C-alpha cells in the first residue's frame, strides 16, 4: 500500500522542473558564488511588493513568526519557507510512522520521495496562498475582485516555487548548506541588525527618538542632561528596541555558540589499521535547528487555519477551541492576537509578567515547545541519514568499530546513544527558545537560536570545504 502511494507521484517526474545534480564536485569558490546569487535572488523577492493588493497595513498576528519563516509581509515572500518546511514535516511524519515505506538506499525511491515532497510543497503553497487572500490580508475579496485575487495567488505560488528550486540548487551541491536555513538566518540577522542600528526616528510623545537601540543610546546620552536617566531609558524603554534586549541577544548568541562545543565522544578503533583509534562526536544539537524550524512551521499552520476558521465561523464551539482572535494592547508585534483556545496556549507569553500571571498558559506553552522539539528531533534522524542504522553502516564501510565492543554490536550501542541525544538536544534547543523569549531579545528566542545554529553550521561547512581552522568554537568553549 505504502509503496503504491509513493508510486502515485511518478507522473509528476516528467514535467516537474528539477535541478540536476552536478556530475563532478563543484569547486569551493563556485559554491560561494552560487550561494551568494541564490541569497541575492531571495532578498530581491523579499522586496518586490505583490501586484494588486489594496492594503497590507492591518494587524498581523503572524508577525512574531515571520523572521523564523523568512517571510516578508506584502511581498512575493509573504509565505516565506513555510510551505517547504511543512511539506518536509508531513513526509517526516509519514515515514516515521511507517505509513510511507521508503527505501533510501534505492535511487528511484529517493527521487520519488523528493518529487513527492516537492508536489506537496506546491499544493501547500497554493493552499496557504488561498488562505492568506481569503482572510483579507490584502483587502476584502469583494474589493479585490476575482481576477486580482487569482493573480495574487499565482504570484505567491510562483515565488515559493523559485525558493524551492533555489533550496534544491544548494542542497544538491552547487552551493553551501541548505537554502532554507540560509534564507531564514539572513532574514533574522537583517531584522536584528535593523532593530539595533536603525537610523529612523519616531515620535511617541516623548520627543524624537531613534528606533535602533544602539543609536538611541548614544542619542539619549548626548541630548539628555541627566545621564543616569538617559541610560535607564535606553536600557529599559518598552515601546522601542532597547539596550537590554541587545545585550540579551548577544548573551543568547554566545551561550548557544558555547553549547555547540558540547558533545559525547564515542571511542572508536579501526579494524583495518592495527592500533589506530579515534572518536566519533555526537553533538548536543545533533539535528541542529531542524526541530525548532519544524515547530515554528507547525505553529504557523495552526495559526493560519485558526484565524481563517474564526473569521468565517466565529460562533462555532470547535473553532473557538482551536482559537479565538481579538485585540490585545500589550501584543508587541500586532494588536491582533489569540486570546483563548489552543492558539492562545501555544502562543509565547508577550512578557515575563504575563508568564507569571498566567502560569497555566506558561506551563502548556513550555510543554508544547519542548515536547514538539524533542519529538521532531527524534524522528528527523530517521529521514536525514543520521539514524543509528545509517551511522553503523558508515562505520562498517570505513572499517570502524566502537572501542571495547564487537563489530556486531555497533548498531546496538549506537541505538542506545543517538536517539536519546537527538531527543535531549531537541528539548534543549526548545528550552533555550523559551528562556530567550522570557529573557527578552531582539526578536523571538526561536529566531535567535535558528540564526546562531545556522551561522555555526555554515562555519563548519566552510571550514570543511575551504580548509581553514575549525577550532574557533572549541577554543571559545574552553575559554568560558
Swiss-Prot record:
Keywords: Endoplasmic reticulum, Membrane, Protein transport, Translocation, Transmembrane, Transmembrane helix, Transport. One of its GO terms (molecular function) is ribosome binding. Heterotrimeric complex composed of SEC61-alpha, SEC61-beta and SEC61-gamma. It is a multi-pass membrane protein. This is Protein transport protein SEC61 subunit alpha. SUPFAM superfamilies: Preprotein translocase SecY subunit. The chain crosses the membrane at residues 33-53, 76-96, 119-139, 146-166, 246-266, 363-383, 417-435, 442-459. GO terms for cellular component: fungal-type vacuole; Sec61 translocon complex. It is found in: Endoplasmic reticulum membrane. Belongs to the SecY/SEC61-alpha family. Residues 1-32, 97-118, 167-245, 384-416, 460-480 are cytoplasmic. InterPro entries: SecY/SEC61-alpha, SecY_CS, SecY_dom_sf, Translocon_Sec61/SecY_plug_dom. Pfam families: Plug_translocon, SecY. Appears to play a crucial role in the insertion of secretory and membrane polypeptides into the ER. It is required for assembly of membrane and secretory proteins and is essential for cell growth. It interacts with other membrane proteins required for protein translocation. Upon binding to SEC62/63 complex, secretory precursor polypeptides may engage SEC61 to begin membrane penetration event. A cycle of assembly and disassembly of SEC62/63 from SEC61 may govern the activity of the translocase. The keyword Lipoprotein does not apply. GO terms for biological process: misfolded protein transport; post-translational protein targeting to membrane, translocation; retrograde protein transport, ER to cytosol; SRP-dependent cotranslational protein targeting to membrane, translocation. It comes from Eremothecium gossypii (strain ATCC 10895 / CBS 109.51 / FGSC 9923 / NRRL Y-1056) (Yeast). Residues 54-75, 140-145, 267-362, 436-441 are lumenal.
Amino acid at each position: 500500500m505504502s509503496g503504491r502511494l509513493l508510486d502515485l507521484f511518478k507522473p509528476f517526474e516528467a514535467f516537474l522542473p528539477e535541478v540536476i545534480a552536478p556530475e563532478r564536485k563543484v569547486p569551493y569558490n563556485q559554491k560561494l558564488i552560487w550561494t551568494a546569487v541564490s541569497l541575492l535572488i531571495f532578498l530581491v523577492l523579499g522586496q518586490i511588493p505583490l501586484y494588486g493588493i489594496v492594503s497590507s497595513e492591518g494587524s498581523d498576528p503572524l508577525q512574531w513568526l515571520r523572521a523564523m519563516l523568512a517571510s516578508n509581509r506584502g511581498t512575493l515572500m509573504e509565505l516565506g519557507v513555510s510551505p517547504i518546511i511543512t511539506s518536509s514535516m508531513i513526509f517526516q511524519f509519514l515515514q516515521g510512522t511507517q505509513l510511507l515505506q521508503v527505501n533510501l538506499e534505492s535511487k528511484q525511491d529517493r527521487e520519488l520521495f523528493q518529487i513527492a515532497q516537492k508536489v506537496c510543497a506546491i499544493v501547500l503553497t497554493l493552499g496557504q496562498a488561498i488562505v492568506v487572500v481569503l482572510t483579507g490580508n490584502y483587502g476584502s475579496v469583494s474589493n479585490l475582485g476575482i481576477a486580482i485575487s487569482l493573480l495574487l495567488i499565482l504570484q505567491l505560488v510562483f515565488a515559493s516555487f523559485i525558493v524551492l528550486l533555489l533550496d534544491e540548487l544548494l542542497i544538491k551541491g552547487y552551493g553551501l548548506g541548505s537554502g532554507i536555513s540560509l534564507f531564514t538566518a539572513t532574514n533574522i540577522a537583517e531584522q536584528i541588525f535593523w532593530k539595533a542600528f536603525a537610523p529612523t526616528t519616531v515620535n511617541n510623545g516623548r520627543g524624537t527618538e531613534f528606533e535602533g537601540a544602539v543609536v538611541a543610546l548614544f542619542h539619549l546620552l548626548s541630548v539628555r542632561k541627566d545621564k543616569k536617566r538617559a541610560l535607564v531609558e535606553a536600557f529599559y524603554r518598552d515601546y522601542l528596541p532597547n539596550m537590554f534586549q541587545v545585550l540579551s541577544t548577544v548573551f543568547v548568541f554566545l551561550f548557544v555558540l558555547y553549547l555547540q562545543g558540547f558533545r559525547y565522544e564515542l571511542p572508536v578503533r579501526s579494524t583495518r589499521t592495527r592500533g589506530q583509534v579515534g572518536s566519533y562526536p555526537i553533538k548536543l544539537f545533533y539535528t541542529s535547528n531542524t526541530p525548532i524550524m519544524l515547530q515554528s512551521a507547525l505553529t504557523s499552520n495552526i495559526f493560519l487555519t485558526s484565524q481563517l476558521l474564526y473569521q468565517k465561523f466565529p460562533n462555532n464551539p470547535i473553532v473557538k477551541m482551536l482559537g479565538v482572535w481579538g485585540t490585545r494592547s500589550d501584543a508587541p508585534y500586532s494588536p491582533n492576537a489569540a486570546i483563548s483556545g489552543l492558539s492562545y496556549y501555544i502562543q509565547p507569553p508577550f512578557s515575563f509578567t504575563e508568564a507569571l500571571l498566567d502560569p497555566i498558559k506558561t506551563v502548556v506553552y513550555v510543554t508544547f515547545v519542548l515536547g514538539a522539539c524533542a519529538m521532531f528531533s527524534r524522528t528527523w534522524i530517521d529521514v536525514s541519514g543520521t539514524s543509528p542504522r545509517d551511522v553503523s553502516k558508515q562505520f562498517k564501510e570505513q572499517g570502524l568499530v566502537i572501542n571495547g565492543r564487537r563489530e556486531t554490536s555497533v548498531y546496538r550501542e549506537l541505538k542506545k546513544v543517538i536517539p536519546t541525544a537527538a531527543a535531549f538536544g531537541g528539548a534543549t534547543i526548545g528550552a533555550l527558545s523559551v528562556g530567550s523569549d522570557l529573557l527578552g531579545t531582539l526578536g523571538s528566542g526561536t529566531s535567535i537560536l535558528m540564526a546562531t545554529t545556522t551561522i555555526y553550521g555554515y562555519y563548519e561547512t566552510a571550514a570543511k570545504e575551504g580548509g581553514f581552522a575549525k577550532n574557533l568554537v572549541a577554543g571559545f568553549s574552553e575559554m568560558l
